[in-house]
Regions:
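Acidic (Asp/Glu) and glycine-rich low-complexity loops/linkers
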Residues: 1-81, 87-100, 104-119, 123-139, ...
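Structural signature of tandem-repeat unit edges
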Residues: 165, 185-186
Length: 247
């Protein structure tokens, strides 16, 4: 392995490899005034590894982005960032657990056995992957988008933000819940679904018929009437519900 660290006179890194754990720590000897003047400087750390299959990994980053390109495969993955983005295009064979406090999560072409992605403030984008089991997402403030994804089940929660399922299909149940955001389906599908919003709309196009049970307090409901397909429970307080089936 080769490690490259961008440093300055008073900001440097220590590297330790102990018990199979690689720890890279940034040491900052600057005063707070010097740090203000240094705002925006890119103290990037790059770890070069041969492409191939690796054992379980656990990435933890306090301040900064984590990016892993294609060509790497891990038996399982945990990745956590406090302030920064997670951008992952690597392969994962087992469970993938991704957490971010402030920042976005972008996952492309990952097909783990299960996937759990959560952020406090930021967007979640998952695309072009097949999850062997459950796919779960959670966001406090930010949008969630699943694009060209497949899984056994979808479970998406958002407090303030939209949830979009675009050309994504699960063989089991789809669950989506948001307080002040919308839920949209762009030619998505599932066996059964349970969708709930407080002030958001539920709209879009599904690929197969459903038996709809749709309720709203002050909004409008426009869904197909069918006796075929799985149960689709949709409820909202002040939003509209508009669903069509692709012909």
């Amino acid at each position: 392995a080769r490690i490259e660290c961008r440093e300055s006179e008073k900001v440097y890194h220590t590297v330790e490899n102990s018990g199979g754990t690689l720890t890279i720590t940034q040491v900052n000897k600057k005063s707070w005034i010097e740090n203000l003047a240094d705002f925006g400087y890119d103290y990037r750390v790059t770890v070069y590894l041969p492409t191939g299959i690796y054992n379980a990994v656990d990435f933890q980053c306090s301040t900064g982005n984590l990016s892993i390109p294609e060509g790497f495969v891990f038996s399982s993955m945990k990745a956590k960032s406090t302030t920064g983005n997670l951008s992952l295009s690597c392969g994962v064979l087992g469970e993938a657990e991704l957490k971010n406090t402030t920042g976005n999560i972008l996952v492309d072409k990952m097909s783990p056995s299960s996937l759990n992605a959560s952020v406090s403030t930021g967007n979640i984008t998952l695309k072009n992957g097949t999850v062997g089991g459950a796919l779960k997402t959670s966001s406090s403030t930010g949008n969630t988008r699943l694009e060209n994804m497949e899984a056994d089940s979808f479970d998406a929660h958002a407090s303030t933000g939209n949830i979009t399922f675009s050309h994504s299909v699960c063989s089991g149940q789809l669950k989506a819940e948001t307080s002040t955001g919308n839920v949209r389906f762009d030619e998505a599908d599932c066996d059964t679904m349970k969708v709930k919003t407080s002030t958001g709309n539920v709209t879009g196009v599904l690929l197969s018929p459903k038996i709809f049970y749709a309720t709203t307090s002050t909004g409008k409901v426009n869904v197909p009437h069918s006796t075929e397909g799985g149960l689709a429970e949709i409820s909202t307080s002040t939003g509209n519900i508009t669903i069509t089936i692709k012909e």
